[in-house]
Amino acid sequence: MGKTGILTYHSAYNYGSALQALATQKAVSCFSTETEIINYRMNSQKSIYTLYRTSFGLKTFAKDILQLPIHSKRKQRAEKFETFFNQFFNLSEECATPEDVYNIWNRYSAIVSGSDQIWNKHSLELETCDWKYMYPYVLKDFPGRKISYASSISNMTDEELKM
């Protein structure tokens, strides 16, 4: 087996996502000599974790003002997670769109999707996204092997799964 790409939630600033991505990378490396986490970080996902919001409005301004007392803690947390990602993950270059993923997938003989709730359109990262750009659909035309590893659909209905 050649190089294996891993498509997962790896860049959320929470311990669960970071550790599941690391565990998935370790598990896949048992079956593939070379693994790489595809650094797919959609703008909608990045905006959840940004320190400085670019959308304007009274509500956003008020929320930002309320965050000022903990700004330095939030910044420190973000920096620590980014350091962890860069130190422990074997990452591809950053991909912000499905097209970016398409442009690099020829380097992989297989792509593993998972683990975590990569198919749960009710997750925080996916609620604001166009569902057709999400993980199962990004790989729809991938010519290599597509593997799902410990993926969860959470509480999606049968009707939602037909999408």
Model-assigned labels for residue ranges:
Residues 1:
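Phosphate-coordination loops involved in phosphoryl transfer and adenosine-cofactor binding
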Residues 4-15, 19-20, 24-162:
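Aromatic- and Gly/Pro-rich donor/ligand-binding loops
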